Amino acid sequence: MKIFCIGQNKTGTTSLTKTLKKHGYKMGNQRKGELLFRDWKDGKFQSIVEFARTADAFQDRPFYMGDTYKYLDVNFPGAKFILSVRDSPDQWYDSLIRFHSRMFGAGNKPTARQLKRAGYCYTGWIYDVITSLYGTTEEDVYNKDKLIDYYITYNTNVIDYFKDRPDDLLLINLKEKDGYNRFCKFIGQAPKLESFPHLNKTK
């Protein structure tokens, strides 16, 4: 059974990865997935579909970007999707800013110049991802209204897409008391942990 974690970055995707591995799932290579950003931007979803044949479960980019989940759903009948969320859009935004500040801004919210110079998949990759995904500009790369609007709209669209297929989508906040048990029921396995591991937290 194929599983796609399609929640936004900073919604517990690292913890989900650890949990899925514990339950025997082979996770897709995250860096190889991130390198498919340009294909996603150009609408070349077939390369993403082909990459999704290389493992049992996937998370992070490009799987939480735009309508990618729709192409995956069509190409992988019977696949399950996990939409992880935070307590609120503001909490998600603040967590993302803290994480990027640590990764790319030397402790402060990164500037467009810093993002353009950041070396990750390629120099400027993170700038290209942010501006393409959220529709922001060089003048205000982390425009709060645009990022939060994307977060809300994306989650709403995913929920609406699967509204008549409750067995195919798990909407989950990893902080929920019964979240891990719901996860286990969703994937059809007995619990192997007491709860979700809390990893990659940004303070």
Give residue spans per PLM region.
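Gly/lys/ser-thr-rich phosphate-binding loops in alpha/beta enzymes
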Residues: 46-85
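Short active-site oxyanion
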Residues: 1-3, 55-57, 80, 167-171
